[in-house]
């Protein structure tokens, strides 16, 4: 199904075109088009609608889940001094999950028709159109699917009474991640920390796309040696 020398027509729905690029997909998807208006994905208005998510849907949908999870642990006998470090641990675990997901799933290399198509839907579209404000945060359905492995991890490493709080902390970490991600693309930070985060992330998009996988911090890039060269620690003379 891969067409030799295929050229994508940006005026037509893209999803079922990109698979035809074959091995050329990797180069094509990492040549960003930095316009605010995103492309059309599907001919069908219904399927097109499902690909669009406003940023504020993330806190509106998932913060109540965070509150409910923490309240469950409280109702099962956990005190506030016990819950706070558990929630913080959940946030910390999310940062690792964020890194692994971004590096090994979102940046997997593909060349088959369906591999390219799936990758474009999952993350390739964001690299091709990084300023598309309606396809930047996770759609609620995708987040719900990711909840299952994270919930199983929470249950496996904690007790029945603390698992909801740990999961809630992870979900809070996710909300912070997605809102931060949107902010880095569409806001103009004035504080040094957020200015550096924006520079760090846009460096991943426009300069060194196989480094700098952390969104909310560069911690795991430092740990696993994927810090961009401009951020790497200087060697002593």
UniProtKB/Swiss-Prot annotation:
Tell me a GO cellular component.
endoplasmic reticulum membrane
Q: What is this protein called?
A: Dihydroceramide fatty acyl 2-hydroxylase FAH1
Q: Function, please?
A: Fatty acid 2-hydroxylase involved in the alpha-hydroxylation of sphingolipid-associated very long-chain fatty acids (VLCFA). Probably involved in the resistance response to oxidative stress.
Q: Which family does it belong to?
A: Belongs to the sterol desaturase family.
Q: Look up keyword Metal-binding and say if it applies.
A: yes
Q: Name one Pfam family in it.
A: FA_hydroxylase
Q: Report the EC number(s), separated by commas if there are several.
A: 1.14.18.7
Q: Does the keyword Transmembrane helix apply?
A: yes
Regulation: induction: Up-regulated by H(2)O(2) treatment.
Q: Which reaction does it catalyse?
A: an N-(1,2-saturated acyl)sphinganine + 2 Fe(II)-[cytochrome b5] + O2 + 2 H(+) = an N-[(2'R)-hydroxyacyl]sphinganine + 2 Fe(III)-[cytochrome b5] + H2O
Tissue and organ expression note: Expressed in leaves, roots, flowers and seeds.
Q: Which gene encodes it?
A: FAH1
Q: Which PANTHER family match?
A: FATTY ACID 2-HYDROXYLASE, FATTY ACID HYDROXYLASE
Q: Which GO terms describe its molecular function?
A: dihydroceramide fatty acyl 2-hydroxylase activity; iron ion binding
CC cofactor: Zn(2+)
Bilayer topology term:
Multi-pass membrane protein
Question: How is this protein organized at the quaternary level?
Answer: Interacts with CYTB5-A, CYTB5-B, CYTB5-C and CYTB5-D. Interacts indirectly with BI-1 via CYTB5-D.
């Amino acid at each position: 199904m891969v067409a030799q020398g295929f050229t994508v027509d940006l005026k037509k729905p893209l999803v079922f075109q990109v698979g035809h690029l074959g091995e050329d997909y990797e180069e094509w998807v990492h040549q960003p088009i930095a316009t605010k208006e995103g492309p059309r994905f599907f001919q069908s208005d219904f399927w097109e609608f499902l690909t669009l998510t406003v940023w504020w849907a993330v806190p509106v949908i998932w913060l109540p889940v965070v509150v409910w999870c923490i309240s469950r642990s409280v109702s099962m006998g956990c005190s506030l001094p016990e819950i706070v470090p558990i929630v913080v641990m959940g946030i910390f675990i999310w940062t690792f999950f964020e890194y692994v997901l971004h590096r090994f799933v979102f940046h997997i290399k593909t060349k088959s028709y369906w591999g390219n198509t799936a990758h474009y839907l999952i993350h390739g579209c964001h690299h091709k159109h990084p300023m598309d404000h309606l396809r930047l945060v996770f759609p609620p359905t995708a987040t719900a699917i990711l909840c299952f492995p994270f919930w199983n991890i929470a249950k496996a490493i904690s007790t029945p009474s603390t698992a909801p709080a740990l999961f809630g902390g992870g979900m809070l970490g996710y909300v912070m991640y997605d809102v931060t991600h949107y902010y880095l693309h569409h806001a103009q930070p004035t504080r040094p920390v957020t200015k550096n985060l924006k520079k760090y992330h846009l460096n991943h998009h426009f300069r060194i796309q196989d480094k700098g996988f952390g969104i909310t911090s560069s911690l795991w890039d430092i740990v696993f040696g994927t810090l961009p060269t401009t951020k790497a620690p200087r060697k002593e003379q």
